[in-house]
Amino acid sequence: MKILNLGDWHLGVKADDEWIRGIQIDGIKQAIEYSKKNGITTWIQYGDIFDVRKAITHKTMEFAREIVQTLDDAGITLHTIVGNHDLHYKNVMHPNASTELLAKYPNVKVYDKPTTVDFDGCLIDLIPWMCEENTGEILEHIKTSSASFCVGHWELNGFYFYKGMKSHGLEPDFLKTYKEVWSGHFHTISEAANVRYIGTPWTLTAGDENDPRGFWMFDTETERTEFIPNNTTWHRRIHYPFKGKIDYKDFTNLSVRVIVTEVDKNLTKFESELEKVVHSLRVVSKIDNSVESDDSEEVEVQSLQTLMEEYINAIPDITDSDREALIQYANQLYVEATQ
């Protein structure tokens, strides 16, 4: 049996942005086409199907229904675990959008509790977001499980949320009994020991620029996984001056950031030609105008990320979850600005 595995979808992201929705539709179509060619009728989605925790719009609800119907028409059953973005409250499993909006469909199976599922003789644990309410239940399930494989929405230490941005979280030792652990939650692909973060099926922000995205096929008979890259990297970063010959059509309908390290007479034309085809264009100057200093006085230097975190931690009268979200957002902006 072959299973298609897909990371976080984040339906409704950026206030139901139509361009992002087009990216998601394109990715779903690619996955369906691959499934049809390879006889796949089972998908596992790794949580965060939805993006906005507390205000899912009618447009997002409609979009989710259309996707589920498209999957049903293709003969595909979707297994999905509940991620933190699917929850109304971060530390309580209910209410959650996946259960409320998707569980009613016959071809969708929502997992809001740790569950061992038999996929043609291959036992896989499907484990939702671990929070204050269900930590004991999840740890006990893992301790007594006979499954060799685990799908989760884990927040583990030492992996990467975005390329270049290391995560903080639980040490992954409690998962060592599994042969392989696959996880959503972090958006870039990374792995260590028996844990692999599979990444999102498509790029969503500038923090994803030039970062491979796609989906994964797992064969329960051979226990082999294969990465199938998305045909399009929707967020691209290029450097100017551009080395070699550029075909501007390659950037049609993409979000492009140009890092300028030198200004010459052709820069204006370069920007103009890109503007004709791209979805959005950002030009960032990285020209080094620094001047060497003879000042030998020692100065204590802290990283910008450390300073941002200290500033956010000093903000009064905000909840711990809001503080954590602000730090994560600030780190994301830092990655976008420095890559």
Swiss-Prot record:
Q: Does this entry carry the keyword Nuclease?
A: yes
Keyword vocabulary terms for this entry: Bacterial host gene expression shutoff by virus, Degradation of host chromosome by virus, DNA damage, DNA repair, DNA-binding, Exonuclease, Host gene expression shutoff by virus, Host-virus interaction, Hydrolase, Nuclease
Q: Which organism is it from?
A: Enterobacteria phage T4
Is-annotated flag, keyword Cell membrane? no
Give one GO biological process term: DNA repair
Its EC number(s):
3.1.11.-
Q: Which gene encodes it?
A: 47
Species lineage: Viruses, Duplodnaviria, Heunggongvirae, Uroviricota, Caudoviricetes
Q: Which family does it belong to?
A: To phage T5 protein D12 and to yeast RAD52.
For this UniProt entry, which residues form the secretion signal?
Answer: none
In Gene Ontology terms, what is one molecular function of this protein? DNA binding
What this protein is reported to do is described as:
Exonuclease that plays a role in viral genome replication, DNA recombination, and host DNA degradation.
Subunit comment? Consists of two subunits: gp46 and gp47.
Q: Which InterPro entries match?
A: Calcineurin-like_PHP_ApaH (IPR004843), DNA_Repair-Maintenance_Comp (IPR050535), Metallo-depent_PP-like (IPR029052)
Taxonomically, the superkingdom here is: Viruses
Q: Which SUPFAM superfamilies match?
A: Metallo-dependent phosphatases
UniProt name for this protein: Exonuclease subunit 1
